[in-house]
Amino acid sequence: WSERYAAQAEILRYIGHVADRFDLRSLIRFETRVVSATYDDDAGVWTVRTNRGDSFRARFCIMATGCLSVPNTPDIPGLADFGGTVLHTAQWPHQPVDFTGKRVGVVGTGSSGIQAIPVIAETARQLTVFQRTPNFSLPSRNRPLTEQDHAQFEAGFEAYLESLQHSDFGRVPPGAATAPVPPRDVQWQRYEALWQEGGGAILYAFPNILTHHGVNDVACDFVRGKIREAVHDPLTADDLCPTNHPLGVKRICVDSGYFETFNRPDVTLINLRREPIERFTPTGVQTSERMIELDMLVFATSFDAITGALLAMDISGRDGRTLKEAWADGP
């Protein structure tokens, strides 16, 4: 890769390279959606039908639909009435989006929102961020990768692959973790070093950071302290500090200048716990306290996770029982 966190265009080129190298395109039916999968008890096979009218029969039907593939858009009254541009971070246009001089609203401060907000703020006339739940985010420290970086990686490639087989999340911890519970000042020093390193390294600071409340509490205090250092307005800083979940139990986000973005005079944070959205209007958003005029609206509201793609299809198993029936009370 050309940088520590490769951008979309570079990742897309790599995917295209893999598809061409292994002649995968000939095995893929593009612009085709599966609408149903029905199991035949007598024959012991599945019949899969698509929106193009095709049908396929197979002994095995593997649903590789992914956990995060169906975008989630909140059901808020009036969205269809909004006269501006509506985007979702999970369905981004192939063409560049120009926010120059626009009044933009971003709904959501999860992974994609945290990545998009600093970039949008660079050119938007006014950016309003609507946040329900703040999230922990760590600095990415993104940078171009040098020839030395590549040489070091290639020299230890076999050992690196072996270590990945025994790691969680498919990554190698950035150094030996200390056990069991060091003093608070020792924890703080290690967190500071890993904060400067960037990425999700803090999650690997100590082996019990995800299982020991005391260790995790110190980590949370450290990150919240960094947020308050970065954000000048105390109320905004408090609103951006997560307090209802430990560090690491939700997916850790990484960012480039996310918290600092809220120091800009043209960026406003709306805490939806205090000031919920009541409805969208043709010209913007009506909250419980004010009307906010917008030209563009960006939903960074994640996905219908885990089951969304599966329940979107009509899947019937043994005895004609549908997946929706089987999972009526949860999967």
Where are these regions (language model features)?
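A short, basic/flexible loop-to-alpha-helix module at the beginning of a structural domain
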Residues: 89-101
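Beta1/beta-strand and adjacent pyrophosphate-binding region of the FAD-binding site
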Residues: 100-110
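Aromatic pocket-lining residues of Rossmann-like dinucleotide-binding sites
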Residues: 116-120
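N-terminal FAD-binding dinucleotide-binding subdomain shared by FAD-dependent oxidases/monooxygenases
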Residues: 1-80, 84, 95-96, 109, ...
